């Protein structure tokens, strides 16, 4: 078994916590000695023990770690946060070598973990290949803004709604389950006031007791004109209203209103960055999506295409502002979801090696 195989095991461990770690990265670990896997572990939840400590806790006898090799998908931390530093625990356990999937881009770590381990007699090796585990986390600490994904479903003739201002349900069950997974991977979800009025969406992830559900954001000119009987306001979890006017009514402790003279996509991104929100899913509508594309702030586009023809004056998927220049994206994958097809593209410079 090669280093890459053990690292792949660590990746599978990390993925068990998808949607549970909030602004923390997904991290998995595998402890190996004499070609035998002694223990595996991962970071289960935001605020809980880190992957390295979780792995060590699974040993029948702590002495087993002496002389072992630890495979971990992300550089171990060397600072005191919600948890004590992992590097200290790793060194104290007598681990001989740590094989690392990627250096942590967060400036509080960024090479300091490797330095600590080396200074305490632990061999280290960075082999790469785990960057795709934490695309948004890496992007946020490298680019200092959230990773933006634009998502929409459309008919085969490129329309998102039938003519007339009523909701058109386009995709089947498999695509809707896939959307749930996509929401789980994002820390915030944004829609415009029109989408709230026409679709009356929940924008929730159907997982009970999710510790940090995505923040749901509604972009509106006047928050007071929103329909507060909409089902989004009957659910738990944070809701942000981005309005040009102050909210004059009390609509619940989980609703927060931010005001600006005009909420441009750049201002939205700036607000999220200030709150250390690393990922945003823009779910509509047509106008809001056009604004984000026109300002060149979309890093990934997820399109669900269904074999329906809406025709006529039905609303196109992206409608509004013209582009100053053509945006180039690269195909990530195409997936069949029963009768629907999902196409994912990502901006070239955002592709993880």
Language model feature labels by segment:
Residues 21-35:
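N-terminal glycine-rich anion-binding loops that anchor highly charged ligand groups
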Residues 33, 142-143, 346-348:
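Active-site beta-strand termini and strand-to-loop segments that position acidic
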Residues 114, 130-134, 176-183:
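Hydrophobic, well-ordered secondary-structure segments
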Residues 31, 36-132, 293:
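Zn2+-dependent cytidine deaminase-like catalytic core
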Residues 122, 145-146:
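Short, well-ordered coil/turn segments that N-cap beta-strands
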Residues 134-145:
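Flexible, polar/acidic helix-loop-strand segments at domain edges
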Residues 3-25, 60-66, 82, 147-149, ...:
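Enzymes that bind and transform nitrogen-containing heteroaromatic metabolites
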